Amino acid sequence: MKNFKINFDMDGTIANLYAVEDWLPMLRAYDPTPYAKAEPMLNMSAFARLLHKAQRLGYEVCIVSWLSKTSNEDYDNAVTIAKLEWLKVHLPSVEWNEIKIVAYGTPKHEIANGVLFDDEEHNRDMWGQGAYEPCEIMEFLRGLK
């Protein structure tokens, strides 16, 4: 299965952005703080071990995440930095094969392939076969051969 990609959304999938108090007013005020403060939604030690196993088996592990709907160039840069830092803090041992942080609303099925874990039903519907809800991440990774 070489080069088969396993893609993870961040917000609402591995990072609990929507549980950060006042996240929406902060994003609307061009404040990237919620992206940095979001708590992990998984046991990150176990998740990292399974990602390493996937890579040893020949799979690529990737991030495909949107920027904020509230957007300008400076804010997009700040959000990108916050998301990259979040990954370094919570998954420091993972060497991602690809990280795509793209404009809000970018059709993910047009910029990535393989499987997708995403909390947004529309993204999963557009992706088609191989799209999963976040609650299926660990079971999927444990089943890789």
Model-derived regions, located:
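Short, solvent-exposed polar/charged micro-motifs at secondary-structure junctions
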Residues: 73-74, 107-115, 142-143
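A general structural motif
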Residues: 1-3, 58, 113
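Structural alpha-beta junctions
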Residues: 57-58, 88-98, 128-134
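Donor nucleotide-activated moiety binding/catalytic core segment of transferases
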Residues: 84, 93-114
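Alpha-helical substrate-recognition element adjacent to the catalytic core
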Residues: 5-7, 11-86, 90
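Conserved beta-strand termini and adjacent loop/short-helix elements that scaffold enzyme active sites
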Residues: 64, 101-104, 134-135
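Short, flexible active-site-adjacent loop segments at beta-strand->alpha-helix junctions, enriched
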Residues: 18, 67, 105, 120-121
